[in-house]
Amino acid sequence: ARGDVAARLTAAGIDTRAAVIYRQTLLDLTEEARALLSDRRPVIVPLYSPRTAARLAEVATPRAPLHLVAMSNAVTRAAAALHAENRVIADSPDAPAMIRAVLATVRRVEGM
């Protein structure tokens, strides 16, 4: 698991056991997503995890101008291979901050 918390706690002298509580299955891009990324119109892409950002960078070959909105610096680093018009990092790693960042990006893109 990311961060290997159980191993770090055990190394600090706290007896722990690891358990996977949530596992996200990576999916391929839908045809609709591929079509949007192939267009020349701007696409705002909210990215919530480094894993998803890396996967998008791996499978996408966008022609569209991308405007990436990332939940954290780690997410932005994972998307480094994607060419983007701009990259925004949310003020904090939570849903309200992501919503604010996406809305600010929408306003900026629409003003272009």
In which residue ranges do the predicted regions lie?
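Conserved beta-alpha
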Residues: 1-112
